[in-house]
C-alpha cells in the first residue's frame, strides 16, 4: 500500500516482502540502506523502477510496530505475578520470520523494559512446533489437546 500511494507503483506481495527483508527496520540504522524496486506504474501501466530508502520503510512500518508493542504491553499487564517474574528473568523470545526485522528486539525491549531475544532458529520454529503437535496426535477436532 505504501509503495502504491507514494510512487503510484503496483508491486506484488513477494516484492513487498523482499523490500522489508532487504531494508526494513524497527529502529534507525547506523548505515541506512536502500533498494531498487521494480513494478508497474498504476497510471501508465508501464514498467517502472524506483529507489526506496530504509528510513521510508521504517516510517511505513511504524504503525503496525506500535500496535505490536501495544499488544505485548497489554499481554504483560495481564500476566500473573509469577509469570511476570519469569519474564523479567528470562525475557521475551521472538520467533517466526517477523522476528528477523532489524532492531525489532531493541524496539520491544525499549518499549516494554523487558529483555527481548531472537530465536536462533526463528524461521524454523513455527513449522517445527506444528510438526511436534502432529507427531503427538495432539490436534483433535480443531483444538490442541494437552495432558492436563
What does each model-identified segment do?
Residues 1-62, 77, 87:
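Phosphate-binding glycine-rich/basic clefts of nucleotide- and phosphate-handling proteins
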Residues 9-17, 31, 132-148:
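Acidic, glycine/GT-rich loop-and beta-edge segments that sit at the periphery of enzyme/chaperone cores
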Residues 14, 56, 63, 67, ...:
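Conserved active-site and cofactor/substrate-binding residues in soluble primary-metabolism enzymes
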Residues 19, 72, 94, 130:
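Residue-level signature of catalytic and energy-coupling elements of molecular machines
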Residues 24, 28, 84-108:
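Glycine-rich phosphate-binding loops at beta-strand->alpha-helix junctions
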Residues 60-87, 133-137:
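Phosphate/ATP-binding catalytic cores across multiple sugar-kinase/actin-like superfamilies
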Residues 106-131, 140, 146-147:
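Conserved phosphate-binding/catalytic loops in two-lobed NTP-binding clefts
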Amino acid at each position: 500500500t505504501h509503495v502504491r500511494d507514494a510512487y503510484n507503483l503496483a508491486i506484488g506481495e513477494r516484492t513487498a516482502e523482499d523490500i522489508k527483508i532487504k531494508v526494513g527496520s524497527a529502529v534507525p540504522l547506523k548505515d541506512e540502506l536502500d533498494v531498487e524496486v521494480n513494478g508497474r506504474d498504476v497510471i501508465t501501466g508501464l514498467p517502472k523502477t524506483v529507489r526506496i530508502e530504509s528510513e521510508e520503510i521504517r516510517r511505513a512500518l511504524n504503525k503496525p510496530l506500535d500496535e505490536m508493542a501495544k499488544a505485548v504491553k497489554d499481554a504483560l499487564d495481564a500476566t500473573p505475578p509469577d509469570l511476570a517474574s519469569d519474564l523479567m528473568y528470562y525475557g521475551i523470545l521472538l520467533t517466526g520470520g517477523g522476528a528477523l526485522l532489524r532492531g525489532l528486539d531493541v524496539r520491544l525491549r525499549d518499549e516494554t523494559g523487558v529483555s527481548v531475544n531472537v530465536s536462533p532458529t526463528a524461521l524454523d520454529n513455527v513449522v517445527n512446533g506444528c510438526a511436534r503437535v502432529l507427531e503427538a496426535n495432539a490436534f483433535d477436532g480443531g483444538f490442541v489437546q494437552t495432558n492436563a
